Amino acid sequence: MFLEYREGVLHMEGASLAGLADRFGSPFFLISEARLAANYRALERGLAGAGVRAVLRYCAKTNHEAAVLEVLARSGSHLLASHAAEVELALRCGFPPERIAYARPVLLPEELGAVLAAGVPLVHVHRPADLDLLETAAARAGRRVRVSLRLRGEGGLALSPLDWLNRRLGLGSGEVLDAARRLARSPRLELAAINFYLGTQQSSLKGFGRAFRRVLALLQRIAAGTGVVVREVNLGGGIPSLSLRKVGPRRLLARWRDLPGSAGGPERQEELAAQLGRRFRELAEGVRLPEIPILAAEPGRAIVGDAAVLVSRVRSMEGRWAFLDASRNFLPESPLLFSRRILPLAEPPAAAAGNPGRYYHLSGSTLNTLDVLDLRRRLPRLEPGDLLAFCDAGAYSISRASPYAGLPPAVYLLQEDGETRQVRRAGGIDQLLHPMTLREEPARVGR
């Protein structure tokens, strides 16, 4: 098993997390090379088994550690970059430029120039004015550039604040048709894809089905009006990490107790990908298009989320509060939005033996009032020195870790051969000072 207790100690891919904590200290991140590759292959197999041509572009902003990118480059993944430095990093990690796409809601002329000079062939466009910038950049680079138009969510009331915020990005259906007509006349730009985004952690086939119908209807109108055959439909990100739970009112009142095996895993990812692929193929076969488009996706959480854990130590206790040496700096997403499994490294006694544990609030190590890692979490009785593993810690964690009131922890890669290698040093004074410009002598206080 990926996570399991052996002789009373939590192991990840056969490696003792307590043993690693003794070696490395805490807190630290541990990423599984095998799990990364398995998650990617599961999505790839699921879509291929559904009988659709597919492209998977790993969303690099989810976790752009070089060790992660190297594993995925070797696996054959494509990549979605969100800034020019990410493009450069992807190239250094083994991604050829033809397997890189670029998406940023605010396109900057200087950055577009660098991205096109690097050979990136596909750029996402979020608003009509972006076409002017891209046309100019393509002409300066002497390049013909493929364009993916982002289709904005429409229809009905937004069901959540996040849904409402998401609708600020992209083009409406009429704007997509206008852009398609313009691109059909452009000597430098080619309409290659329509993309959309339903939101994070989407597992409902109904939502994807509605979006597929809408995009396929647009492709028919584009083909009829311009003669252009759009060859790719991109469902964007949102494919979930199946071990991460959305939080609702019921969750906030519950007292959960986590188990190592109560997670998703590559098998469930493959099943979900197959369901998405079959639904897309069924709908595409029902419309009049010259060919079934390629189905593209930009998974992030689904690949890297459950491939990592954050190990942290309880440093002190005060009533129901356990104070840890990790903080929300390392896991920035609010526990009021998502809930991850939290496992003690020492196997808890069986509840049947009269040890049900108790519920705790888990505080981070900073003075930030909101530095709370979880609330009302049922765990075995905790004492200072106890170790906890925060599961599903691979997405939007290391890439967003900051030196606010504490420095980011080290990151280690658990290799497929069972060896552990450090892939990011813990934050130190050099990291803190590197971007700063200082006077040659210390500043004097007062007059």
What are these regions (language model features)?
Residues 1-145, 185-186, 190, 224, ...:
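A charged N-terminal "starter" segment
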Residues 16, 32-35, 39, 43, ...:
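General structural feature for long, well-ordered alpha-helical segments within catalytic domains
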Residues 59, 146-152, 195-197, 234-236, ...:
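Short beta-strand segments
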Residues 62-64, 85-86, 106-108, 127-129, ...:
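Active-site-proximal loop/turn and secondary-structure-junction residues that shape catalytic pockets
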Residues 69, 92, 112-116, 134-137, ...:
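Short acidic, glycine/serine/threonine-rich loops at helix termini
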Residues 95-97, 164, 407:
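Short, solvent-exposed loop/turn segments at the edges of secondary structure
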Residues 154-313:
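Active-site loop/helix belt of alpha/beta enzymes
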Residues 271-286, 290-447:
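Charged (often Lys/Glu-rich) extended helix/loop segments that serve as interaction or gating elements
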